[in-house]
Amino acid sequence: NLNRTNWPKKIFNIYWNVPTYFCHQHDVYFNELTKFDIKYNPKGNYRGDTISLFYDPGNFPAMVPLKNGTYDIRNEGVPQKGNITVHLQQFTKELDEIYPKKISGGIGVINFNKWRPIFRRNVNNLKINKEVSIDLVRKEHPKWDKSMIETEASNRFEKSARIFMEKTLKLAKDIRNKNKWGYHGYPYCPTASTGNPSFDCDALAMNENDKLSWLFKYQDVLLPSVYVKHVLKPEEKIGLVRGSVKEAVRISKKFEHLPKVLSYWWYAYEDKMDTFLTETDVKNTFREILINGGDGIIIWGTMHDLNKEKCEKLKQYLSTILGPIAFKVMEAVKKRTPLNF
């Protein structure tokens, strides 16, 4: 029911995580974020007192795809072969160089997507991680059958993936303890596939998220991704957001510290990146985040979205559609009134 309303939470925040400093060279500024009650880093960069995003930090093992179809094997490629010390040393160095304590604070986001810690979830452009892992075991045990090899590969991969993700998070929390830390895109919930009328996470996905309790118990914030595709039907876009937020809230309630659920939301469509979400899609997705128990929205964008023309278009979009909707959400929160749009 697209017209349903609900009482919002007492505390809810909307954040701006777009590198709009890039627009300053074109004399385009986004000072109106303040009047729309959107929290942002004053310099318009990815890292500051309000929120800080770290892309592929440190030296995680990774099979980095190259344009010629081959891979750059970084830190031995897969976690079970990688050197954790080298990774953590590099991460510490990066934090010291680009994120000194004097500017630290707010939300700290680790964005690593070269593999997923659940072996089965390494599909499509991540399937190379499964292939390499299976090949390593096959070379060690050429007489084992396929099932034994895959089971052993999965066990080795997941055990080591946990070490890398867990120790990275603990290090961040230890040396930048003013931040509220979490991994971008977790918990993962592939909901809006055609043929899934409920849009809830399936039992297998929920079970796999439960297996990641070792990660979530250390996260201060849960950061599910709720980017939508233009090709989806309106109810599928709504369902994707609803399912992802509900799953993150379910995970949050498993822990005494109740990590906040802040959904990463992109103003462009995943499959049509030069097109902003329509006013209806913004309203529908924001509403779902709010009324299904979310604690906030992180509006995201990339430098690829920003040349002079795109900066001006984004500013116009913020002023006419995105900002006013965000303001209405925040007014409903502050006044404790139902959200009606």
From Swiss-Prot:
UniProt record similarity statement: Belongs to the glycosyl hydrolase 56 family.
Gene Ontology terms: cellular component: extracellular region
Gene Ontology molecular function: hyalurononglucosaminidase activity
Its job: May hydrolyze high molecular weight hyaluronic acid to produce small oligosaccharides.
Tissue-wise expression: Expressed by the venom gland.
EC number(s) recorded for this UniProt protein: 3.2.1.35
Keyword entries, A-Z: Disulfide bond, Glycoprotein, Hydrolase, Secreted
Top EC class of this enzyme: hydrolase
Chief location: secreted
Classification via Pfam families: Glyco_hydro_56
Record has Glycoprotein as a keyword: yes
Organism annotation: Vespa velutina (Asian yellow-legged hornet)
Database matches in PANTHER family: HYALURONIDASE (PTHR11769:SF35)
Protein name: Hyaluronidase A
Reactions performed catalytically: Random hydrolysis of (1->4)-linkages between N-acetyl-beta-D-glucosamine and D-glucuronate residues in hyaluronate
